């Protein structure tokens, strides 16, 4: 996929609809076809936030492509002692071929990308989680064959996952509904970006009514009510978000063949019930596996593989 060769992925808005579809197609191919990088490459993981799926799936993806991985814990690098991001970026570019960053501020990610002359991948920020949404779209595509025209409903906190879902669905030609409590809506700038991508051809609905949002949806999605860094707010958020739990009752309002997604980790009994996450409509484990395949496709496209 020559179009992404050497490029950053800081946001799903960096992709065109065609590039998104080509990435999903390549991810599907890589489930049964082996590719190798054109020469031995090194991926650096610079993660300031805890990670299970993102860390392991990026590591395995790079190994399966024939590359190597260095796990750069910020706490044992000079970043933790105040070395400027721009200095760190200009050093790491001389050792690495690609850098995946998981951090709090989107601006820190953007600064790395500005100063490092190697590709930089957003492995999660407080604003966006693009790699997760690539896996979500691949999962929906596997379940419904075609995703254009489908409706995805997200219920819960208008966080980084909700932001990236709006962009991803707009690129994929899907309708997206975001149901949040008042005051917890997605980032307004990302909403505007998604609306510009959709260009009136698909629906982007923001509502405080989870039942309205769920009616007729083919994909029902949720995430934790308090993201990393918001743990102190968890007790205050619980009563506010309780009406936004994905339960069997809420799921019954969706299409009969609707699937349920959750980016994990899940707090059973909070944003989703045990019955739903373990139920017949849950595709959560397929979704988690697909992190490996979409990130392998992304690395192969950015670094070049054959």
Swiss-Prot record:
Q: Which UniProt keywords apply?
A: Amino-acid biosynthesis, Arginine biosynthesis, Cytoplasm, Transferase
Enzymatic reactions: carbamoyl phosphate + L-ornithine = L-citrulline + phosphate + H(+)
One family from Pfam that matches here is: OTCace
What EC number(s) does this enzyme carry?
A: 2.1.3.3
Q: Where does L-ornithine bind?
A: 160, 223, 227-228
Its localization reads: Cytoplasm
Q: Which GO terms describe its molecular function?
A: amino acid binding; ornithine carbamoyltransferase activity
Q: In which pathway does it act?
A: Amino-acid biosynthesis; L-arginine biosynthesis; L-arginine from L-ornithine and carbamoyl phosphate: step 1/3
Q: Does the keyword Protein transport apply?
A: no
Q: Which GO terms describe its biological process?
A: arginine biosynthetic process via ornithine; citrulline biosynthetic process; L-arginine biosynthetic process
Its GO CC terms are: cytoplasm
Residues that, per the record, bind carbamoyl phosphate:
51-54, 78, 102, 129-132, 263-264, 291
Query: Would you say which domain of life the source belongs to?
Result: Bacteria
Q: Does the keyword Protein transport apply?
A: no
Question: What PANTHER family does the database record attribute to this sequence?
Answer: ORNITHINE CARBAMOYLTRANSFERASE, MITOCHONDRIAL, ORNITHINE TRANSCARBAMYLASE, MITOCHONDRIAL
**Protein family:** Belongs to the aspartate/ornithine carbamoyltransferase superfamily. OTCase family.
Purpose: Reversibly catalyzes the transfer of the carbamoyl group from carbamoyl phosphate (CP) to the N(epsilon) atom of ornithine (ORN) to produce L-citrulline.
- What protein name does the entry list? Ornithine carbamoyltransferase
Ranked from the top, the taxonomy reads: Bacteria, Bacillati, Cyanobacteriota, Cyanophyceae, Nostocales
């Amino acid at each position: 996929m020559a179009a992404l060769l050497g490029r950053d992925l800081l946001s799903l808005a960096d992709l065109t609809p065609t590039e998104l579809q080509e990435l999903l197609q390549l991810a599907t191919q890589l489930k049964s076809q082996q590719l190798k990088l054109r020469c031995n490459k090194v991926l650096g993981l610079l993660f300031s936030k805890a990670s299970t799926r993102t860390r392991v799936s990026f590591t395995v993806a790079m190994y399966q492509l024939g590359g190597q991985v260095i796990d750069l814990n910020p706490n044992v690098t000079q970043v933790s002692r105040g070395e400027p991001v721009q200095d760190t970026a200009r050093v790491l570019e001389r050792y690495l071929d690609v850098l995946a960053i998981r951090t709090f501020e989107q601006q820190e990610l953007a600064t790395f990308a500005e100063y490092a002359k190697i590709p930089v991948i957003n492995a999660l920020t407080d604003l966006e989680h693009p790699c997760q949404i690539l896996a979500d779209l691949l999962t929906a595509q596997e379940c419904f064959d075609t995703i254009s025209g489908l409706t995805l409903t997200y219920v819960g906190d208008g966080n980084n996952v909700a932001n990236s879902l709006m962009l991803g669905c707009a690129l994929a030609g899907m309708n997206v509904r975001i149901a949040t409590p008042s005051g917890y809506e997605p980032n307004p700038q990302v909403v505007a970006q998604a609306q510009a991508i959709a260009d009136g051809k698909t629906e982007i609905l923001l509502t405080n009514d989870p039942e309205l949002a769920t009616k007729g949806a083919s994909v029902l999605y949720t995430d934790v009510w308090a993201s990393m860094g918001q743990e102190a707010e968890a007790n205050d958020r619980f009563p506010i978000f309780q009406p936004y739990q994905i339960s069997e009752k809420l799921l019954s309002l969706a299409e009969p063949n609707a699937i349920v997604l959750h980016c994990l980790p899940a707090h059973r009994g909070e944003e989703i019930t045990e019955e739903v996450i373990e139920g017949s409509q849950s595709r959560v484990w397929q979704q988690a596996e697909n992190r490996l395949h979409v990130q392998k496709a992304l690395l192969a496209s950015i670094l070049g593989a054959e």
